């Protein structure tokens, strides 16, 4: 008999699928609806000490592509397929004092479901580190099963928050360590893809004591410009700032980032996020080594909390385990990470005839052939400039 249940960072989940920190998890009612729908866990909208003020107008929209001309636009039109989501929403506009009693009520209503509190404060001084600790203590005392540190929002209105922490390995380590000093529950770090190498920041989080890394948040991006009006498709008074791109378009990039991290830290815990709407996509993250998978965009388009999405995910997992019963697979752990080591350096991919391959170097008659170290990868342009 197949089992959906997993244990991740010491927390038992009824299934490995979570609704991620985003607009769908911004209210008590939505989180309760998500648990009623069957999600194994929910990560709250990011909680801060004080309320924030979002921009006027739309905070998020969806980009669609037309099969006839392949255009990508936020405009709704017949036959267009989902391409991605775009948002420039900040963290929760409700302060910690608003969230604390609601966390308690949610856990009382669903004691067996996993409630993760996403939190964020600033960085760069001891006061902000204490703010992280205050948030951690309040959320865990209110019933949160774990904490997710938001090091990844790409468009915060303060320079010492969000992805600006996630781009700095020193801050990743220091903030994580400060939270771990106060935490009695597992601590996850949610990283930004907007960095040179996420392995570096993941390592910093683990040095700080992180129990897991979540990858990744949305990719920094701009909305499209309407070719007729020459205005950004989402703007305020004609102006726009960078926002976050999510949904199907980021799936391959998110998988590549995840593969680098799970290969670097095969014995560590990872939660995958980015571009998932059904089990076949979630399976990619599990096969690369993730213990849980989070969903946002697909849920937003399905009654805000994704009742049909979680049904498909659970049904897909059940069917997959049944198909592989002869392989002895009964749980996610039986197949988790079995494709992680298939991701290798490009130089390790077989050529039609290895004797003809010079590793990208031209063989010049009269000169000795270059000695190419095993596993060598040519430097990027940026690396070449630095050297």
Which residues make up each language-model segment?
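Glycine-rich, positively charged N-terminal anion/phosphate-binding segment
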Residues: 2-7, 27-110
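N-terminal small/glycine-rich loop or linker at the start of catalytic domains
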Residues: 4-21, 59-60, 78-85, 106-122, ...
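Active-site mouth loops of central-metabolism enzymes
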Residues: 13-27, 87-93, 116-132, 188-196, ...
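Alpha/beta enzyme core
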Residues: 32-37, 41, 122-271, 280-295, ...
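Glycine-rich, proline-tolerant flexible connector loops at the mouths of alpha/beta enzymes
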Residues: 46-61, 79-94, 147-167, 217-224, ...
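C-terminal helical cap(s) of enzyme catalytic domains, especially alpha/beta-barrels
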Residues: 51-69, 222-243, 286, 298-330, ...
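Active-site beta->alpha loop and helix N-cap motifs at the rims of alpha/beta catalytic domains
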Residues: 68-169
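Extended, intrinsically disordered, low-complexity segments
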Residues: 68-76, 251, 259, 308-387
């Amino acid at each position: 008999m197949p089992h959906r249940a997993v244990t991740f960072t010491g927390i038992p989940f009824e299934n490995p699928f979570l609704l991620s920190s985003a607009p769908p998890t911004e209210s008590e009612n939505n989180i309760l609806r998500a648990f009623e729908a069957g999600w194994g866990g929910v990560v709250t909208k990011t909680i801060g000490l004080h309320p924030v003020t979002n921009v006027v107008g739309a905070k998020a929209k969806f980009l669609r592509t037309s099969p006839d001309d392949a255009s990508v636009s936020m405009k709704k039109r017949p036959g267009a397929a989902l391409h991605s989501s775009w948002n420039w929403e900040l963290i929760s506009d409700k302060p910690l004092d608003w969230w604390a009693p609601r966390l308690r009520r949610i856990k009382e209503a669903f004691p067996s479901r996993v409630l993760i509190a996403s939190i964020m404060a600033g960085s760069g001084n001891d006061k902000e580190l204490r703010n992280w600790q205050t948030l951690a203590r309040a959320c865990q005392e209110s019933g949160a099963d774990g904490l997710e540190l938001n090091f990844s929002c790409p468009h915060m209105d303060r320079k010492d928050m969000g992805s600006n922490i996630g781009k700095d390995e020193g801050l990743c380590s220091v903030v994580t360590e400060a939270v771990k000093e106060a935490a009695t529950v597992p601590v996850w770090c949610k990283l930004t893809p907007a960095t040179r190498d996420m392995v570096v920041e993941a390592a910093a989080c683990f040095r700080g004591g992180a129990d897991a890394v979540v990858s990744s948040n949305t990719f920094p991006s701009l909305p499209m410009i309407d070719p007729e009006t020459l205005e950004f498709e989402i703007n305020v008074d004609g102006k726009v700032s960078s926002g976050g791109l999510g949904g199907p378009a980021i799936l391959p990039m998110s998988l590549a980032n995840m593969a680098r991290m799970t290969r670097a830290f095969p014995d560590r815990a990872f939660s995958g996020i980015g571009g998932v709407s059904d089990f076949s996509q979630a399976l990619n993250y599990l096969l690369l080594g993730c213990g849980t998978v989070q969903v946002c965009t697909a849920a937003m388009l399905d009654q805000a909390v994704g009742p049909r999405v979680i049904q498909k995910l659970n049904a897909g997992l059940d069917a997959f385990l049944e198909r592989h019963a002869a392989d002895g697979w009964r749980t996610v752990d039986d197949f988790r990470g079995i494709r992680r080591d298939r991701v290798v350096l490009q130089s390790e991919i077989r050529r039609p005839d290895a004797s003809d391959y010079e590793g990208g170097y031209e063989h010049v008659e009269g000169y000795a052939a270059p000695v190419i170290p095993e596993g060598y990868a040519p430097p990027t342009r940026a690396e070449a400039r630095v050297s």
